């Protein structure tokens, strides 16, 4: 190629690759087959190697390089990334405004200038730029220490969303600047990504925040690159004195440097304007392209901010107002019984679709017959529904004043709706059970339980794939999963495609099948506690599985333990011991375990620390943690010899209280149980 033609060809290749990325990962409409995409990428790489002057900071070839990381390094923030205090009422907002005015010594009637913005529901990060170039990035972590996720942040916004992390700043940036903001998934991108996961046979994410947090903390940057994350900036910090007088000037400077800032940001003069903004945003919150659960109110004047300072956890110059949960009235269409892995029949409520927290919802579950009777839920009722925690659909209560007399109580079937076996409710139990040993619904549930992330973590094996395997007669127990032919996986991943998609469609089932085989291969190496939990032994949850693994130290000893030995295990009572013994002595169960071992599944005992602040302690987790997921926190405690319980009692040694901690925190206070915040919890993990 002539040198004069190289710049135009490089631009063309970059544009085509970006368009293909955007179409595949955001729009869910592949433009190119994988082979054609790889050819274009290789051509661009070769062209840039021959002409280094053509390399741009935002070229697809420059997103990141290198192998996946094995762990994230710790980063100490130059200035702490403090969380915000929460308020939920007008009175509390007025108290905040009054406190600001009092601390500043403002005369009565002089309004405070505020900047208000939607509270973004994503993951807070910090980006460091030197001489205009992006050099490093980290998560908020515990506010003092974060995790180095530079490689992943380099690919945020690499799918044409125009809301990414700039590799080079525009204009005249300072020698060093720290930019803070939120990594998030816009609703359209989240929905497209979930469609793609379902198409590949993988479990979709529950909400955009979980998806964004999980994606940014991937050890393999290539996973992050394939997902349409965005970044919105809201803060800039310099090592010396700020050249800005107001926060609003900072936001304007961030936009001039090439960052996306929130178009809904506003300046308000006084509390009355803040309340008016809050009301407008509450009405529009579900029309916005991203999830938001409130607004953030910040003092605009930076000199005033310095005078106000910060308390131990929160700045005194800012506060977050959180919206109350949205509730809607709807009418129940029907109540029916769903069959789970243990044969338990769970009442499911189908109702007229309603929009809750930005999503259409048409179904919720009731735990059992007693809950249904306690709430007085009837078929045909008008009810109030909400999404608990903005995620899980929940029937709150009926609206008896709207009853017509045609409503009827739901009665559990006498026969299983899936296999036709007898349904029973044993004396003393709250649930109805299917007695069919070969019930397909139970097998599908057991397979999903076996494959879930906290068990053997077989990525991509969800309910639809499990049902397909059962329908084809390929799988009758866990061990059969490891003998499913590659061609069967291909068939399960195949689906009709439009003619114009044929090039990509031919490769998709094979690639998805390869991913499934790889996931099964990875699952062969596991821990004893995960393996015991995956087996679905009655009354053996994660905590009991971990306790059994620590006590016995090997699978053979668990399988051969008699009731007396089992009763000698901490927190294993006579009933649980009897259930475990009955399960391990059932010949069919022993055959499944033997076949799993023969298939190469190797459950190994973990080395548990015998000393340290968690050794031998019972810990309860409540509220949300910003530094890690609940599952990760639980695993860290158990690795250090602790036990995680779901309820607070006098036997509880420690309660870890995160954001929005609830009744467990109150009970811990009433019982005098030691309480640790997230910062102290992270410190204890390091001891």
UniProtKB/Swiss-Prot annotation:
Keywords: DNA damage, DNA repair, DNA replication, Ligase, Magnesium, Manganese, Metal-binding, NAD, Zinc. CDD domains: BRCT_DNA_ligase_like, LIGANc. Zn(2+) binds at residues 416, 419, 434, 439. Pfam families: BRCT (PF00533), DNA_ligase_aden (PF01653), DNA_ligase_OB (PF03120), DNA_ligase_ZBD (PF03119), HHH_2 (PF12826), Nlig-Ia (PF22745). The keyword Repeat does not apply. Its EC number is 6.5.1.2. It catalyses: NAD(+) + (deoxyribonucleotide)n-3'-hydroxyl + 5'-phospho-(deoxyribonucleotide)m = (deoxyribonucleotide)n+m + AMP + beta-nicotinamide D-nucleotide. Its cofactor is Mg(2+); Mn(2+). It is an enzyme of class 6 (ligase). InterPro entries: BRCT_dom, BRCT_dom_sf, DisA/LigA_HHH, DNA_ligase, DNA_ligase_AS, DNA_ligase_CS, DNAligase_adenylation, DNAligase_N. GO terms for molecular function: DNA binding; DNA ligase (NAD+) activity; metal ion binding. Belongs to the NAD-dependent DNA ligase family. LigA subfamily. This is DNA ligase. It comes from Anaeromyxobacter sp. (strain K). The gene is ligA.
